[in-house]
Structures are given as structure tokens and as C-alpha cells.
Regions:
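A short, solvent-exposed loop/turn motif at the edges and junctions
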Residues: 67-102
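Extracellular beta-sheet/turn segments enriched in Thr/Pro/Gly and aliphatic residues
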Residues: 96-139
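Short, ordered, surface-exposed loop/turn motifs in non-cytosolic proteins
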Residues: 24-28, 33-48
Length: 139
């Protein structure tokens, strides 16, 4: 009888075990204007840039049941979309996708680099928010 109880407890524990999955890596970068000047106080997701235009969004994780993860046999995809906005500038969406990114270890990072916000001057009203322009690093 005692062996049955221990066996049932062990199976229950194994089936309810959780593992940590990534829902958003730590995202960091700098927001600049079209003249390559840093922009302070830009809303980036749930945070704001400092006066040098730098920002950092914390990593987000969630717990997933081991049994469910075993059935899929691969790490889940990660899709992140964060809105950047500042009065006087055209808002944009920063997007990140990794087809198996949910399996990354704790401490995952995405260093974006420089993101260019365009001034609202001489722009017509848009129904859709465009993707952000990311300035690539010169080699």
C-alpha cells in the first residue's frame, strides 16, 4: 500500500513539474532622432529612455508544465512587439521574433543598437503604426 502511494505521488510530481520559458529577452538600445541626436523621455514599452536615449526592458519569463512541453518536443516561439512613442515624433513598433526562442536560458538579451524616431513634421496621419527603423552599426 505504501509503495502505491509513493508511486502515485512520484507520478503526480513528475506530471506537474514546471520549467521556465522565455516570453521576452532583455531588450536594450538607444533611441535617436533623424539627426543622430539621442532622445530622452521616449516611452519604450513599460519604460522610458534616459536623457542619452538609452533604455532597457527587463527579461520576462513564464512557467510551463513539463508534460505539455514534452508533447511539443521543441521550444515555443517568441514574438515581442514594443511600442516607442514621444510627443512630436512618429510612433513605431519594435518587433522581435525567434521561432524557438522560448527555450533560451535565463539572462537572454537582445541588443538592438540605435532606433531612429522620425519627427511628426510634414507627415500625414497614418492609420497603421510602422515598424521602427534600426540603424545598423558601421564596421
Amino acid at each position: 500500500m505504501q509503495m502505491k502511494v509513493l508511486c502515485i505521488l512520484a507520478i503526480s510530481f513528475a506530471l506537474s513539474a514546471c520549467i521556465s520559458r522565455l516570453s521576452r529577452p532583455e531588450i536594450s538600445g538607444q533611441v535617436i532622432d533623424q539627426f543622430d541626436q539621442p532622445l530622452g523621455q521616449v516611452q519604450v514599452g513599460e519604460t522610458q529612455t534616459d536623457m542619452q536615449g538609452n533604455f532597457r526592458l527587463k527579461e520576462r519569463r513564464y512557467a510551463a508544465f513539463l508534460l505539455k512541453e514534452i508533447m511539443y518536443m521543441e521550444a515555443p516561439p517568441v514574438f515581442v512587439q514594443e511600442r516607442l512613442s514621444k510627443q512630436g515624433y512618429q510612433p513605431c513598433d519594435l518587433q522581435y521574433f525567434n521561432s524557438r526562442g522560448g527555450g533560451q536560458r535565463k539572462g537572454a538579451q537582445w541588443k538592438v543598437g540605435k532606433i531612429i524616431l522620425q519627427s511628426n513634421l510634414n507627415t500625414a496621419k497614418q492609420d497603421e503604426i510602422p515598424d521602427c527603423t534600426v540603424k545598423t552599426q558601421e564596421k
